[in-house]
Amino acid sequence: GMGDSRIEVLKGIDLEIERGEFCVLLGPSGSGKSTLLNIIGGIDGADSGSITIDGERIEDMTEKKLSLYRRKHLGYIFQMYNLIPNLTVRENIEVGAYLSDKPLDVDELLHTLGIYEHQRKLPNQLSGGQQQRTAIGRAIVKNPDILLCDEPTGALDYNTGKSILKLLQNMCREKGMTVIIITHNQALAPMADRLIHIKNGQVARMESNENPTSIDEIEW
């Protein structure tokens, strides 16, 4: 029956990302970028192949270990901001901090994100951009080893988007965080240490960039 038809989203993807790199996965929508991010994040399983982080294969981890890996080592920024509706901006970010044994300073982060003066508001009292910044704060406050971002500036105006990317670039540089961003915005390519072009579920090509451009110098 129809139920058996399987669509292969990713085929023979082979890539390596170094610790502390700012990596951009570039490709049109529907090219399999989000699926790849979910597999790295341990949210989706791959039917075959393996993902190794720090020498450990994700598919060999027990449920308990996988959930610990996600909680302690991963930050995840989705296009949809799944904020907890009955918690304030500050409390939403503190939820992220509780999960970590090395969290960033919440006040400092609220300032950096430009939402310090909105910290007592509930999500439904915020603009889309403020909600997105709160969601980003919750992911970053954990001070994760790996930060996965799915079109992190998708819903943001140009300046807010730029300030968020600057924050992500700084986190990568200052904290040695591995940041993986998926986007269809070609303009972001020069800011990456590593640029991975994804096309029809495959790595079309991979480029390393010795001298990444600061986001300040990028226009789109």
Question: Where are the language model's segments positioned?
Answer:
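Conserved beta-strand-loop-alpha-helix hinge in the C-terminal portion
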Residues: 202-220
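ABC family nucleotide-binding domain
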Residues: 1-191, 197
